A protein has these predicted regions:
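Post-DEXD/H (motif II) to motif III coupling segment of the RecA-like Helicase ATP-binding lobe
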Residues: 3-70
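Switch/connector loops and helix/strand junctions flanking conserved nucleotide-binding motifs
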Residues: 3-4, 33-38, 84-87, 195-196, ...
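Short glycine-/polar-rich loops that comprise or flank the Walker A/P-loop
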Residues: 19-23, 50-52, 69-73, 155-158, ...
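Conserved C-terminal RecA-like helicase domain
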Residues: 8, 98-188, 209
């Protein structure tokens, strides 16, 4: 939060003239760096602001530690076969979804089907999906009810949705209901950090992500240790 422009509010905490601190330690799972020559920006590899690096722990070391610090993980991809695509279009099932979600793309629909296949095959219990917008995240939630109706062979999936502008009490209810059972939680960015639900065993990126920091932070939701969890799936 402190990295970036020296004039941003969070950077205020690093300036000795603002807050007098004798000793300070910084801990992060996602080091943020600024590349450039400007003195107007702060970067975590600058010892003038953040001090010298005293310890670093890799993902591999955290997984292989005895006992482990985080869960091992697998990166998986699921696709839709040609026969499945033909069956979906020939039976007009895609059109049924389009009647409800007029702006849904074939790719979004295929992603929802692929997630159901992954849940069924890998016995995933609690998944969270990340989307590039709140609207797409909420649409993905609505899709799940339609898929349950159109493809009963995939079983039922409880779906929840949270967003940053939700009242805190409403968001807490959604998170509690999700944590107490099995299902899917959709969001845009509000679950990227600050969430500690060990039961989460799958993270889904429904839209391309280019930020390494965002990817690591989001993937970390599925790497908390939990009884019975062998892998976190990404």
């Amino acid at each position: 939060k402190t990295v970036g422009s020296k004039t941003k509010e969070m950077a205020h905490l690093l300036h000795q003239k603002n807050v007098r601190i004798k000793k300070c330690i910084f801990m992060t799972a996602t080091e943020r760096l600024f590349r450039g020559d400007s003195d107007e920006f702060m970067s975590m590899d600058d010892p003038r602001d953040y001090g010298s690096l005293i310890y670093e722990l890799s993902f591999k070391e955290a997984i292989n530690s005895k006992p482990p610090i985080i869960s091992d993980y697998k990166i998986i991809t699921f696709g839709i076969t040609t026969p499945e695509i033909e069956e979906i279009y020939q039976s007009n099932k895609y059109l049924e979804v389009k009647k409800v979600l007029k702006d849904i793309t074939a790719r979004e629909f295929a992603t929802a089907i692929a997630l159901r296949k992954a849940i069924k095959k890998l016995k995933i219990k609690n998944a969270i999906s990340f989307h590039r917008s709140i609207r797409r995240a909420d649409n993905f939630r609505v899709q799940q009810d339609l898929i349950t109706k159109i493809f009963p062979s995939y079983g039922k999936l409880k779906s929840f949705h949270v967003r940053g502008d939700m009242p805190t009490s409403d968001r807490a209810i959604q998170m509690r209901n999700f944590a107490e059972g099995e299902g899917l939680m959709t969001n845009a960015r509000c679950l990227t950090e600050g969430v500690d639900l060990p039961a989460i065993d799958c993270v889904v990126f429904t839209d391309p992500k280019r930020s390494k920091v965002d990817i690591v932070q989001a993937a970390g939701r599925a790497l908390r240790l939990s009884k019975g969890k062998k892998f976190g799936y990404i």
